[in-house]
Amino acid sequence: MFTYYFQGLALGAAMILPLGPQNAFVMNQGIRRQYHLMIALLCAVSDLLLICAGIFGGSALLMQSPWLLALVTWGGVAFLLCYGFGALKTAFSQSLELANAEVMQQGRWKIIITMLAVTWLNPHVYLDTFVVLGSLGGQLAVEPKRWFALGTISASFLWFFGLALLAAWLAPRLRTARAQRIINIVVGAVMWFIAFQLAREGVSHIQALLN
């Protein structure tokens, strides 16, 4: 059974490692040392729920609801554009320290809501957990399926806590004005790139539905 566990662990790591909205948010909270472990836990728990839903039957709902997929896609596009704009606005702010100070004054609930939006409004999360993991895990018997799910869940917990702790450890070097400007530019550019990719997919989905 450990074979299925390590298969899930490897696949989960491969899907979670690329820079995306979740990773960028966890990294920034780690650099600020602002509720970073709480955010890592909430991201990992969100992944746990999505992984279990995808592997244990939720993929059928998404595949049978193309309009739901289109709605999630365009909601994600709107959010990523706004998130990227905020990062770029901070990067090119004349007073970067003032902009960072305003971010540091955000309350816990605002940070939690942003994290939930980053996770649950990202269509790639549903494609990864419902389509990829759902199609692979759905082919397994009950016991191997549980070990496969446990492996992918382990990858999420290890990655998010590792990223948050590493970012907090490197915070003294990454809190400089130059480093913060570079990080915000990269995050903003990546968010907009993902948003435009999703928009193309969203247009294709709508065209397919209307034909």
From Swiss-Prot:
Reactions it catalyzes: L-arginine(in) = L-arginine(out)
Keyword Thylakoid: no
Predominant location: membrane
Membrane topology qualifier: Multi-pass membrane protein
Transmembrane segments: 1-21, 37-57, 68-88, 111-131, 147-167, 179-199
Keyword annotations from UniProtKB, A to Z: Amino-acid transport, Cell inner membrane, Cell membrane, Membrane, Transmembrane, Transmembrane helix, Transport
GO CC annotations on file: plasma membrane
Compartment(s) where it occurs, according to its Swiss-Prot or TrEMBL record: Cell inner membrane
GO molecular function: L-arginine transmembrane transporter activity
Source organism superkingdom: Bacteria
Family listed: Belongs to the LysE/ArgO transporter (TC 2.A.75) family.
Biological role stated in the UniProt entry: Involved in the export of arginine. Important to control the intracellular level of arginine and the correct balance between arginine and lysine.
Listed NCBIfam families: 2a75, PRK09304.1
UniProt-recorded name of the protein: Arginine exporter protein ArgO
Source organism per UniProt: Klebsiella pneumoniae subsp. pneumoniae (strain ATCC 700721 / MGH 78578)
Gene that this sequence comes from: argO
